[in-house]
Amino acid sequence: MNTSFDPVAANSNSANVTPGYMSGFGNSFETEALPGALPIGRNSPQRCAYGLYAEQLSGSPFTAPRGANERSWLYRIRPSVRHSGHFVKIDAKLWRTAPCLEHDMPLAQLRWDPTPIPEDELTFVQSVRTMTTAGDAHTQTGMAAHIYLITRSMVDQHFYNADGEMLFVPQGGSLRFVTEFGVIDTEPGEIAVIPRGVKFRVEIPSGPARGYLCENYGGAFTLPERGPIGANCLANSRDFLTPVAAYEDDDKPTELFVKWGGALWSTALPHSPIDVVAWHGNYAPYKYDLRTFSPIGAIGFDHPDPSIFTVLTSPSEIAGTANIDFVIFPERWVVAENTFRPPWYHMNVMSEFMGLIYGVYDAKPQGFVPGGISLHNCMLPHGPDREAFDHASNTELKPVKLTGTLAFMFETRFPQRVTEYAATSDALQDDYADCWQGLERRFDPTRP
C-alpha cells in the first residue's frame, strides 16, 4: 500500500504555509502529493500524469455567478463511478432529516444536560443523534442540529453526505478527518467543515469524542459581510486552513455510506475512495480555530446584537436573513459603562440552538454546562437567569475579561422541531423554565 499521509505532504505552490494546510477562505487552491500530478494550463488533458483520471466536483450549478461558483478538479486513481456500486438502504439509527414530524414540538424553552459517552462501540455514522430539524432538505433549505458520541474510529469505512454540508464542533476529544482532499485534525476550540459530496472517514486519535454537528441543507457557509466594521476583525480569511493533497493507494475492501434523500445507504467497494493525488479549485473541506476570532464589542455603553459574533453564515434568498448563522461567544473584554452587560431579555424571529464547548456562559452560570444544549425557538422569550440578573445589576462596573469560555449558536430563520430522541432523552431538563421564576416584580412608581 502506498499511503501519503505525511504531515509535510508536498504542496507545489506554497512553501510557507503550516505543514499539511493551505491558508485562506474560498481561495482557488492547488496542491499535489506527487510532483507533476497537476496538469498545467488545462483541467482535463488527453492523458493525465501517473495514469490518473480527471474529475470535477461541483458544489454549485455551472451557471452560478463567479463569486458563488464552487468547484474543484480532482486527479484520482479511479473515478468516482468506481466508488459506487449496488446501494442498499440501511437503518439510519437516530439520524433524522428535515422535515421530521415524529414528535409534537413542545412550546417551551428547552435545555439538555450533556449526553454521556456510551460504552458501546460506535463509529461516526452510528453515533449521530439528531436533536432538531428545520426547513426541508429536499428543497435545500434549513438545517439539522446533531450531537455525535464516537467511541471507535472508522476502519475500512467511508462516508459522504449528499443532503448537506457538515459543520463539526468538537467539545470533548479530537477528530481526524481523512478526506479525498487531505487530512484535517481538529480539537475542542476548532471547527471543521466538510462540503456536500466529499468522501471522508472519521478517526479518534485520542479516544472517545463528543461534539455538535450542524447539517446545512442550504447555501454553503461563507464569511459574513463586515459592513462598517471594515476590512478586519471577526473571522479573518487567513486563519482558515484547507488540507494539502494526500492519498491512499489501497485495494483493501471498504464500505461506503451515503446520506441521500434523508436516508442512509451503503455499498461495498474493493478499494479506498481516498485516492485523489492532486486537486485544484475552491470547493474543499477546511478547519478554523475559533480562538483566532477577533471579537468586536461595545467600548462605550449598551450590549450590541449577537450578530457581531458571527463566524460563518449560510445565506438565504432574503438579504440579511440567514438560512443559518454560526455564532460564537468567545473570550473577550467587557467594558461598557452604566450598562446591563449580559445578553438582554429577548424574543426573536430566529430560532437559536446553543451549545457550550468549555467554561461558563455569562447569561446562564448554572445549569448550562459544557456539552449541554439549549433551544430557544422562534418568538419564545429568553434571557439571563435570576443569578446572572442580580449579579449584573449590582456589580461594580469595571473592565472585566471573560476568560476560559466558549459557547456557540446555530441560528436559523426556520423553527427547529425537536426529534423523538431529543424529546424523550434523559438529558432533557424538566425544570429549565424555573431559572426565571426568581425574577420578581421590582416596579415601584414612587422610585424613578
Curated annotation (Swiss-Prot):
Tell me the enzyme class: oxidoreductase
The pathway that the record names for this protein is: Amino-acid degradation; L-phenylalanine degradation; acetoacetate and fumarate from L-phenylalanine: step 4/6
Q: Which GO terms fall under molecular function for this chain's record? A: homogentisate 1,2-dioxygenase activity; iron ion binding
The protein's UniProt keywords, in alphabetical order, are: Dioxygenase, Iron, Metal-binding, Oxidoreductase, Phenylalanine catabolism, Tyrosine catabolism
Q: Which residues bind Fe cation?
A: 346, 352, 382
Q: Which EC number(s) are documented for this chain?
A: 1.13.11.5
Gene3D superfamilies, from UniProt?
Jelly Rolls (2.60.120.10)
Query: An example Gene Ontology cellular component term from the record?
Result: cytoplasm
**Sequence positions that bind homogentisate:** 361, 382
BP GO terms, sorted = L-phenylalanine catabolic process; tyrosine catabolic process
What's the subunit arrangement here? Answer: Hexamer; dimer of trimers.
In terms of NCBIfam families, this protein maps to: hmgA
Q: What name does UniProt use for this protein?
A: Homogentisate 1,2-dioxygenase
**Organism of derivation:** Nitrobacter hamburgensis (strain DSM 10229 / NCIMB 13809 / X14)
Tell me what gene encodes this. Answer: hmgA
